[in-house]
Amino acid sequence: MQRRLIGKTVRGLALCLAFPATVPAQTQDTLFTERPLFVAGDAVLAAGFIAAAVAAAPADKWFTRQLQDEARQANRLLSRGFTVGRHWGNPGTLIAGAGIYAYGTATGNRRVQDLGLHSAGAVILANVVTGGIKVVAGRARPHVDTANARDFQLFRGLRDDAYRAFPSGHATAAFAFASVVTAETSHWWPDARWPVGVLTYGTATITAVSRIYNAQHWASDVLVGAAIGTVTGLKLFRYQHSHPDNTIDRKLLRAGLQSTAGRWSLFLMPARL
């Protein structure tokens, strides 16, 4: 039974990771045109994540036991890799987004600036959603009791961080960043689409698994977090580019820095790329 559940979970997660890479290609020809915020493909993406989370829930304890195994916990390579993944989820993604935006601003490269602003924005927005759910759901983290994966209590998350397991904020941030960066690079630099997608979604997956390894989340927590991050990132990308005159982009994407006679000053870049 558990093997079937695990197989379904793996297949569902594979579908979730593969599908976002196809979405940006659909946006290339209509990037600056009005289009619906939600399309049929979004339902497929959401259904894939939901199916994976539902399949994983009965096996939450199994995944935790496997990753909490003494041999795996003592493995230095795994420990270091998952430590990097944990730090990437928070604060790495936000720092990376802010750094990319700052570099684009300093060099006057609006495409890079666009990439940084939207990736950081997706991380923040997705974690606002996740943070609200955490407080309401009140799910106990695995380190509280590894034998009880169904310990939920409404609004208990207000009381203690130990009861903010569902969903994973680190997974949310990592997948939000991955979805926006992959979407943006797919449009501006099509040849980089697959390398960037594999790198960002692969790193996001390591971040998600690290949270189970560190007994901070159940498998279903990270899958739902990944869903929120991916969907939020794709929605923000679609909205920002189909509404290029939105307030945030209008104010923050036209700012640049230039050096004149040894002095730095702000200037406005063209309204369109």
Residue ranges with predicted function:
Residues F63-Q66, A96-G99, T146:
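Short coil/turn segments at secondary-structure boundaries
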Residues F63-L77, T105-L115, W189:
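Extended, hydrophobic alpha-helical membrane-active domains that insert into or remodel lipid bilayers
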Residues I50, Q68-A74, A176-S179:
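Hydrophobic, membrane-facing alpha-helical anchors
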Residues R76-A98:
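Interfacial helix-start motif at the membrane-water boundary
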Residues A52-T64:
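Alpha-helical transmembrane segments of multi-pass membrane proteins
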Residues A46-A55, G97:
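Short, glycine/alanine-rich hydrophobic alpha-helices that insert into or span membranes
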